[in-house]
Design a protein with these regions (language model features):
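Aromatic-lined carbohydrate-recognition surfaces of secreted/lumenal glycan-active proteins
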Residues: 1-18, 69-79, 121-124, 148-188, ...
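Acidic (Asp/Glu)-rich catalytic clusters
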Residues: 1-3, 28-36, 50, 54-67, ...
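Active-site-adjacent "subsite" loops/lids of carbohydrate-active enzymes
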Residues: 5-25, 56-116, 130-131, 158
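Short, flexible/disordered intra-domain loops and linkers
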Residues: 17-20, 89-92, 134-143, 185, ...
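Short, acidic/polar
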Residues: 17-35, 99-113, 183-194, 222-226
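Active-site groove signature of glycoside hydrolases
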Residues: 34-49, 89-146
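Acidic, His- and aromatic-enriched active-site or binding-groove loops in soluble protein domains
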Residues: 65-68, 92-99, 141-154, 195-209
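Substrate-binding cleft/loops of secretory-pathway carbohydrate-active enzymes
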Residues: 86-87, 163-225
Length: 234
């Protein structure tokens, strides 16, 4: 560790992983280790596209040279998989979890990630606000909150945890919660039950300008969120 009381960790998105060369990576690693000191990185395997295996292998080899721990990451956003997906209401391209091709894609992502890493984190896009015809049909008479809480528990078990641990029984899976706690239930985040099925939990700790950015996050929010989740899963 470079610091006494905390680790420094960074997250590398799939598109960047696919395009950076080994020479560029070593140049950036030299700079970061000189001026910051990185203990660990999360290598994203999917965000709209898969990170290529040869790129992941290159990253892991280079990071080993620098003594940097490496884990995987997944961001659950995807482009339209067919023409019918254009009708779906998918904020930030998040998945529709009632759509079979998208469910199959998520299962494939989980299996691929578990085959590459013994630990991975699910970034804080693991939610749904889709109200397409498929979602309305499956929701039935339940409220959107009831439906989404149940749906995301099912997705967690059957499309992420189950498939990943079948490929790699020792894989450690972390769910990262976003910083907008007031909307958890409406979007399917379930901190009451998900910590029982995931191996670890984490939460976003970023802050932004209080008046000029889209989420209006106050400076003290990171502290309150960490305290909240310490109580959820002590």
């Amino acid at each position: 560790m470079y610091y006494k009381n905390f680790k420094t960790v960074t997250y590398c998105v799939a598109g960047w992983v696919n395009h950076i060369t080994e020479e560029e990576l070593r140049e950036q690693a030299d700079f970061l280790q000189k001026y910051v000191g990185i203990d660990k990185i999360y290598l994203e395997t999917y965000r709209d596209e898969f990170a290529k295996k040869e790129k992941l292998d290159m990253f892991k080899r280079v990071m080993k040279d620098y003594g940097i721990e490496v884990s995987g990451g997944i961001t659950t956003v995807t482009p339209d998989l067919n023409e019918s997906d254009k009708k779906r209401q998918r904020l930030f391209n998040t998945f529709c979890y009632c759509n079979e091709p998208m469910r199959a894609r998520l299962k494939e992502i989980s299996e691929y990630t578990a085959s590459q890493f013994d630990e991975f984190i699910i970034d804080d896009f693991f939610f749904t606000q889709c109200q397409c015809e498929d979602c309305i049909r499956e929701k039935g008479e339940r409220s959107w909150e009831e439906f989404r809480l149940e749906k995301m528990l099912e997705v967690s078990r059957n499309l992420i945890i189950g498939p990943a641990k079948k490929v790699n029984p020792k894989v450690h899976i972390i769910i990262k919660y976003p910083n907008w706690r007031e909307s958890f239930a409406q979007t399917g985040y379930n901190p009451g039950q998900q910590p029982e099925i995931f191996d670890s939990i984490y939460t976003g700790t970023e802050t932004r300008h209080g008046a000029q950015t889209d989420q209006h996050l106050p400076r003290y929010l990171s502290y309150s969120l960490m305290r909240y989740f310490e109580s959820v899963a002590p």
